[in-house]
Amino acid sequence: FVADMGVDSAIGGLGWAWLPFMLTDYDQVDEYYINGWINDELTKQYADNGLIRVAPTENCFRECGNVKRPINSMADMTGLKIRVPETQACQDFYTALGAIPAAIATSETLAALEQGTVDGVDNSIYNMKSMGVLEKIKYITMLNYMYSGASITCSEEFWNSMTANQQAAFKQAADEAGAFFRENMRADEQDRKSVV
């Protein structure tokens, strides 16, 4: 499992796939990102860089959590320091809102929030929980502004080391795991949204 944004930081050129508001709900995600042209184009770009994007999974829509104040209008974002991934589209989005984006690694996010380096976090509710920051966040704003995809990926070298039968079995298992992960991650995120 690897987030497409993580792959972008290594190979570049993938940022078009998560432009703000390009996809606004999971029906669109399923049609274009999981089963459609976005998946097809990402798969080609991965292959051009020696990677096999075996099956799409899930990383959910990005939201904004912070410890300072509720966000009821764009003006409320002014001056908030928000942890974002090292993705230009995320940084530009928060800059346009008047916030101060801070590109900080996922592994350093909790410490940055606890130390006051940032006031908030941009990520999915599911990932905020996984990062350990959801319990620290006082206010969640459901922006749903950007879908963040992921995939089960392997190197071309590993893929080519398998027989055709092994590749088919690997692909089937990856497709099943991706579908299972999407279903459970979306259900878990919906449960978390109902309590935040």
Range-by-range predicted roles:
Residues F1-Q28, W37, K44-V196:
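N-terminal secretory/targeting leader peptides
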